[in-house]
Design a protein with these regions (language model features):
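Beta-propeller domains
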Residues: 28-50
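A short beta-strand motif characteristic of beta-propeller blades
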Residues: 2-10, 45-53, 91-102, 139-148, ...
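Conserved beta-propeller blade signature
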Residues: 26-30, 70-74, 118-122, 164-167, ...
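Short loop/turn segments that connect beta-strands within beta-propeller blades
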Residues: 40-44, 85-90, 134-138, 179-183, ...
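Beta-rich, blade/repeat-based domains predominating
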Residues: 10-23, 54-67, 101-117, 148-162, ...
């Protein structure tokens, strides 16, 4: 792990998840105060899918099917839902699954594309859970409780090269390389990030992108031999 640079974003608050846009134009980001946005590499944000009723969507994690461009996201607080918005319109969301495993404000927090037609979803805490779901009908394929090493599943990234998971833990301010059961293999401190709730591994640029829920900044953290 090397140094880092930051990108300040405009037009996004409650920055809770991040992934690269499939066309390479920037990021798709989750906001816990509205929904899903696109952000350029210079930080300008545009709306992708939001709902403005009440306090808006408590969107905590986001991922993309690179083949179709469909966006999947998870909602916390009252709803505890996995949703999908289909490309290219991104005009309407559909509920893929309802998962009531966590407590208030400690529920669904993370989601990542597995590349085999399935999704990995993380329940934040109490309990820390890894759930594997069908991306077609939302059925649960497997369920794994993490009882050590991770205190808070803040975001997930499935690493197809390693067949492993990267887990962001905002409570301990760490990035963790784990096996598919959530057992920590290696841990990296990101103490310079106040509330790192978004994580995406980018081998093309030899970095890990993280988003800070407190400041709405994006961090580009250099890594060698990813």
């Amino acid at each position: 792990m090397g140094g880092y640079t930051t990108i300040s974003t405009t037009g996004i608050q409650g920055f809770s998840g991040i992934c690269l846009a499939p066309d390479g134009s920037g990021f798709i980001v989750a906001s816990d105060r509205g929904g899903v946005y696109k952000a350029s590499f210079s930080g300008e944000a545009t709306t992708l899918y939001v709902e403005t009723a009440g306090f808006g969507l408590d969107c905590e994690g986001v991922t993309v099917d690179p083949a179709t461009g469909d966006v999947y996201f998870v909602l916390e607080r009252e709803k505890q839902e996995v949703r999908r918005v289909r490309a290219p319109e991104y005009s309407e969301s559909e509920v893929l699954a309802v998962i009531n495993e966590g407590t208030f404000n400690s529920g669904l927090e993370a989601i990542t594309w597995r590349g085999d037609g399935t999704l990995m979803v993380g329940n934040q805490a109490n309990p820390c859970l890894l759930l594997r779901l069908s991306a077609t009908d939302g059925s649960i394929i497997s369920r794994r409780e993490i009882t050590g090493g991770i205190t808070d599943i803040s975001d997930l990234y499935y690493d197809s090269k390693r067949n492993a998971l990267w887990i962001a833990d905002s409570e301990t301010r760490t990035i963790n390389l784990c096996d598919l059961q959530g057992n920590v293999q290696k841990s990296y401190s990101v103490s310079f990030i106040d509330n790192g709730e978004g994580l995406y591994v980018d081998r093309e640029h030899q970095c890990i992108w993280m988003s800070d829920d407190t400041t709405s900044q994006i961090y580009k953290i250099s890594f060698s031999n990813l």
